[in-house]
């Protein structure tokens, strides 16, 4: 029975080009954007879509085939289940750089603004777990249940 379930999975092979504002890897397959949770820029992953729209899909990483050198072991034991800290697997300084790129791209693409000067990003300690206690609730279609966690 378990083998039947695995054989019915439609896995996509995706090369992650960038990171989006939600911390998901971005790939393009057949002209469609694929947003992959748990994937980092430069990685080659097998992923499974759980949201399918005409112009994009949202997927989760099933297996990392070629790992980024920026991937680190998440410090929270609940990282893979909670959903509250979407970038813990991403090296801290690379996170800052990715967030800066997202910010600049958003200003340019949506705001039609080009910054004359870009200041060095502000960053605190590299590990500020529970610095701000926030409750996050996420419905996971694949599991057909809600996940609740603090970050």
Model regions and ranges:
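Non-catalytic accessory regions of SAM-dependent methyltransferases
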Residues: 1-151
């Amino acid at each position: 029975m378990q083998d039947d379930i695995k054989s019915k999975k439609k896995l996509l092979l995706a090369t992650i080009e960038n990171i989006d504002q939600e911390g998901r890897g971005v790939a393009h397959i057949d002209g469609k954007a694929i947003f992959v949770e748990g994937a980092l820029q430069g990685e080659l992953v097998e992923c499974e879509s759980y949201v399918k729209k005409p112009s994009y899909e949202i997927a989760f990483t099933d297996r990392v085939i070629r790992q980024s050198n920026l991937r680190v072991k998440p410090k929270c034991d609940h990282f893979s289940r909670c959903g509250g800290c979407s970038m813990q697997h991403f090296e801290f300084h690379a996170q800052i750089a990715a967030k800066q790129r997202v910010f600049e791209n958003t200003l340019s693409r949506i705001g039609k603004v080009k910054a004359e000067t870009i200041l060095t990003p502000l960053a605190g300690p590299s590990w500020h777990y529970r610095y701000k206690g926030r409750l996050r609730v996420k419905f996971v279609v694949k599991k057909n249940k809600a996940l609740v966690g603090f970050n």
